[in-house]
């Protein structure tokens, strides 16, 4: 158990993060969401989250957001460029800033959304950057859980009509094994990791079927 204090969700206005916020609130947790200045947070505010304005590129804003917080969950990712302000530096400098702030703030549980096979793919930047974030958590001794999901099924099913046709459309090599996870399932895993026992510093768990 991490304690009675709020959980800070980083990336809480995104597709995955907003579901994490919902799962935590449903489970009776107090939720604080880090939201960039100017970004719309009305959706998660309506759910019951409190908003801390800050930016992963501004370390002092992270410390302010973590004041009184017992756990941090991050689903932030910059490489996708899904929203204004997204940048690959979120995955490098931003993640390191977040981990460093968690260490300084004495966070009792840090839950990282990593990615499957990140430790085997140094030539794939957004995979490898997750591995570097895991390494930084371990280096600083921050109690953490890193979940390594595969691809989101919701993103794959946007192509064609897979349910009526009985097949998925995928762009890539036909010889590379694939693994998928529902974002709603992953949100549940991330929320549950806040209070999971016997996992601090234990490394990473795959969410989904391993290739």
Model region roles, listed by residue range:
Residues 171-195, 201-202, 208:
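Substrate-positioning beta->alpha
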Residues 8, 35-97, 101-104, 118-119:
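NAD(P)H-binding glycine-rich loop region in Rossmannoid oxidoreductase-like domains
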Residues 9-10, 74, 109-112, 146, ...:
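Structural signature of the Rossmann-like NAD(P)-dependent dehydrogenase/reductase core
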Residues 27, 47, 140:
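Conserved dinucleotide-binding and phosphotransfer motif residues
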Residues 2-29:
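N-terminal Rossmann NAD(P)H-binding glycine-rich loop of SDR-like oxidoreductase domains
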Residues 31-33:
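Short beta-strand "acidic-cap" motif of Rossmann-like dinucleotide-binding folds
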Residues 57, 152, 209-211:
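Conserved sequence/active-site signature of Rossmann-fold short-chain dehydrogenase/reductase
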